[in-house]
Structures are given as C-alpha cells and as structure tokens.
C-alpha cells in the first residue's frame, strides 16, 4: 500500500519490500536479504542451509513412482485451486506428488467450480484453511453427486491442512 509506505518513510522508518515467491525454495533470497538488513547474516545463512538440507533430504527420500495427483483447494465465498507458482503447489511437488491443478494449466490461485474438481479428477484433496471451514467444505465435497466417482472422494482421501491464523487475518 503506497500510503502506508509513505507514512512509514515520513516517520523515519526504513521500508523494504521483498519479492514474494511461492515455491518451496523461492523465499531463500528474501531470508538472505532480511539477514543482511538486520545484521544477522550468519543466522540467515544458517537458516537457508537448514532449509536446503531438508529439501534435499526430502527429494532423495521420496520415490518418483506411483505419484499421486493432489489438488489443494480452499473455499471461502467460492472455491480456489492452488496451481503452479503457489506455495501449496510447491509443497505438493516437493513431497513427490503431482500438482493436479498445475497439470491442467492452473497458475497461482484460480477460482474453480465443483465440476472442475470432477474434471481434474484428483487422487487426493488438501484443504488448507481453518478447521471449521475445512470440515464444512469436506462434507460438501463428500456428498456432492458430481464428485462421487472422483478417486479422492470415492476413497475419502480429503485432508485438512492446519493454516496458522496469521495467514488468514
């Protein structure tokens, strides 16, 4: 928000805006930048090394055979799917699965319909949103006639993913 930036600068508070990247490794440059700005380069480098080590460990441990097609969706007023260039998509791929939304051409977060979920036909569905909304959405998905033959619905492979409240306001 340009007005907020102007107020902060006017008050003598330095303002730094980092590029937001939603991939699994995309915020590493931001961590290094913040370490530099805060005079904590060693801590930033240590954190980056830990992140890279963990990602490397995961990629070596997860076989690329029998990859599940995973769809990450949320429902607020409407349904949104996390495609390529999304945090959820990066996590799905890092875990050795296929981001089903990205596979059908969805980029970032896009609004989709119940019918689109049926067309995407995922093996697994993730619901990264507050528990109350996720539970209601899960019931809706499990009981929707259009989705009865979708593998994730048929096999009840719908999972709530805890979202820290700071993410949702």
Locations of the language-model features?
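Histidine- and/or cysteine-centered catalytic micro-motif in compact active-site loops
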Residues: 73-77, 104-105, 122, 130-131
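Internal, well-ordered alpha-helical scaffold/interface segments
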Residues: 32, 49, 71, 86-93, ...
């Amino acid at each position: 928000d340009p007005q907020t930036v102007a107020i902060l600068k006017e008050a003598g508070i330095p303002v730094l805006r980092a590029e937001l990247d939603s991939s699994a490794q995309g915020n590493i440059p931001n961590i290094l930048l913040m370490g530099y700005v805060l005079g904590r380069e060693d801590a930033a480098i240590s954190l980056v090394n830990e992140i890279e080590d963990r990602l490397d460990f995961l990629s070596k441990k997860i076989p690329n055979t029998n990859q599940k097609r995973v769809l990450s969706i949320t429902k607020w007023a409407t349904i949104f799917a996390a495609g390529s260039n999304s945090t959820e998509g990066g996590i799905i791929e890092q875990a050795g699965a296929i981001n089903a939304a990205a596979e059908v051409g969805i980029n970032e977060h896009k609004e989709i319909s119940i019918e689109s979920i049926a067309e995407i036909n995922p093996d697994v569905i993730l619901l990264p949103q507050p528990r109350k909304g996720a539970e209601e959405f899960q019931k809706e998905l499990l009981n929707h006639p259009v989705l009865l033959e979708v593998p994730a619905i048929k096999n009840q492979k719908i999972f709530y993913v805890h979202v820290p409240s700071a993410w949702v306001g």
